[in-house]
Amino acid sequence: LDLCRQTGGETSSLASSNARSSHTALVYRVGGFSFQKYCEWNEAHPAAAASLKENYNRITGIRALFFPTTDDQISWANNWHGNRDCSTIAGCTQTEIEGRLHLREGIEYLKKTCPYVFSDAYLVDVAPQLGVRGSHRLVGDYTMTYDDFLFHKKHDDVIAWHSTMCALNDRAPVEIPLRALMQKGINNISAPGRHMAADKMAIDSLNLIPQCVGTGQAAGVAAAVAIADGTTLRDVDIRKIQDILAGEQDVPLPRNVHTDISYTECAEEHEYGLYTVEARNA
């Protein structure tokens, strides 16, 4: 997004410390224990497992969870550093330092407290670069809001159709338009993924990996079509983009002849999630 900021066009930044986007991450891997065995122990001893996680997070100072990898003996730990603005040097530096500061102490605690699982646990590696969930965003030709979820808004320039983790519409698919990737007042530049134009609430449901992949793919196709046809991104043939995505790249899009109709039928059968209390009261 640095290029978009240098154009002189508008951008917006983080909302609040409570937002998911205000949590950075410095992920790491721990080896020497069986993730399957860990899961079985968790299930058999829920109270002890909850206490172990709580104390581990207290020692490291960061909320973290272990996830499986392709190797049962190596687990990946995701984490959430709250109230961090990764668009600032201070926010990035705090994550880099705090993410490593007490990590080995935490692993020693696991080894001593639960040797049945962690007796041989060791730190495999730490990510060489911090992870961000959000920073600056476009002020775009269209701004995604929770209205897109609560009212199932349809867009003629839809380029991605994704289920999200938003409970307002029971995680039903929402349409993301090309306009949400276009910087207001600036030609021939787009910013998909975590920098798309969305307000401070909606962005938390739109900046996960699936949406980053989907909007990134669409932005690439849009740029290729614009170059091939000699147009700007704003004047690009949206139908051609949609047909390439749905017809050649197997990307489901609503109201497109290349998309399996059963996807739409399923969404309609479930009312696009608009049966929730929040949607009915909107």
Predicted regions located by residue number:
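Flavin (FAD/FMN)-binding glycine-rich loop and adjacent Rossmann-like elements that form
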Residues: 1-262
